[in-house]
C-alpha cells in the first residue's frame, strides 16, 4: 500500500523541483535541498517515516536557522537527531 503512495509523492516532488522551485529561487538553507531530502527520505524509509522526516526538515528550514549540510540519515540509524547536523561554519 505504501509503495502505491510513495511513487506519486516522489513524482510530485520531482514536478515541484523542476517547475515550481526555479520560479521561487534558491531559498533552502540546507544541502541537500528540502525537496531532494524529501525524495530521498521517502525512497529510503517509505511513505510514513519519509514524510515525517521531510516535515521535520521543513520545520527547520526558516530564516532563523543557520542551515548547512543536513543529509537524510542512513537506514541503519535508530533515532534521528536534528541537532547532530547543525552547521558549524567549517566545511570540508
Swiss-Prot record:
It comes from the Bacteria. Its main location: membrane. The keyword Membrane applies. Disulfide bonds: none annotated. It is found in: Cell inner membrane. SMART domains: Haemolytic. One of its GO terms (cellular component) is plasma membrane. It is a peripheral membrane protein. Residues 83-92 have a biased composition (Basic residues). Residues 65-92 are annotated as: Disordered. InterPro entries: Membr_insert_effic_factor_YidD (IPR002696). Keywords: Cell inner membrane, Cell membrane, Membrane. Could be involved in insertion of integral membrane proteins into the membrane. HAMAP family: UPF0161_YidD. Belongs to the UPF0161 family. This is Putative membrane protein insertion efficiency factor. It comes from Xylella fastidiosa (strain Temecula1 / ATCC 700964). The lineage of its organism: Bacteria, Pseudomonadati, Pseudomonadota, Gammaproteobacteria, Lysobacterales.
